[in-house]
Amino acid sequence: MLLLMAFVAWVLTAVPPEGFPILEYHMVTENPRPDAKPYVVPPEDFAAQLDYLKAEGYETITMLEFSKAAKGKGNLPEKPVIVTFDDGYEDNYTQALPLLEERGMKGEVYVVTNFIGKKGYLTWDELRDMQQRGIEIGCHTADHLPLVGLSRAEQEDQVRLSKLLLEWNGIKTVFSFSYPNGSCNAEIAALLRDSNYLTAVTGDAGFNTFQTDPMFLQRVNIPRPRFGLTEFRLRILKAELFSIFGINQHLQH
């Protein structure tokens, strides 16, 4: 174990990554649904993770800021990080947002449009308020169905109608997408481009650079921690190592 830790430390020192992490959260609450526990981070753990990021010099950015910088239309901080939330749970508004605001941090919420207003999920008013307070809203389809198994017509409905519904209800132009269950391929990525999306996030572990295909951005999944900040740091380290060794890398051609 000591030899492994020494090797990892040497790799990170010898080959510093040029990328940055995108964190993947779902629920931030003390009282999750019984079936949702693996996807829940208690508020105190979430706050500690945010404090760790700040102490390490990370600064939060939005997906749109990343897209603009990738096209030479802006600059990123020295250590950027994007904090994302999938599904659109109401605790993203009641629990996560205040903790982000206390630290001057931003986030991205990927919404399943047919869940909006249902018990435990964000309402339209909450979404619009989050947007006004610096949270970027992205799309997570209409029904949270894995896209690869759907017909072309169903894929188009899930990708396009959900985007239009968000924009019709007062959400600024939606540029970013999250694949339900990480279900994606080149054909779906092309559909997203044709539908005027600029970025899409997967469930693959890794860091991202301007060379990463923006339709296959990698993330660091953050489930309910069992070992506190140690586990959080190790998950970021794992993504870092995946990038160093070229695992799960989707590069532009």
Label for each model-derived stretch:
Residues 113-117, 146, 180-183:
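Short histidine/acidic/glycine/proline-rich micro-motifs that form metal-
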Residues 1-3:
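Hydrophobic H-region at the start of alpha-helical membrane spans
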Residues 138-153:
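Substrate-binding clefts and substrate-entry loops adjacent to catalytic sites
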Residues 67-69, 92-97, 115-133, 160-161, ...:
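Alpha-helical scaffolding within the catalytic cores
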Residues 7-84, 90-91, 149-253:
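C-terminal active-site subregion of NodB/CE4 polysaccharide deacetylases
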Residues 89-90, 143:
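Short, glycine/acidic-enriched loop or turn micro-motifs at the edges of active sites
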Residues 21-24, 38, 42, 59-63, ...:
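Short, well-structured secondary-structure segments
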Residues 97-105, 122-139, 193, 211:
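Acidic (Asp/Glu)-rich catalytic clusters
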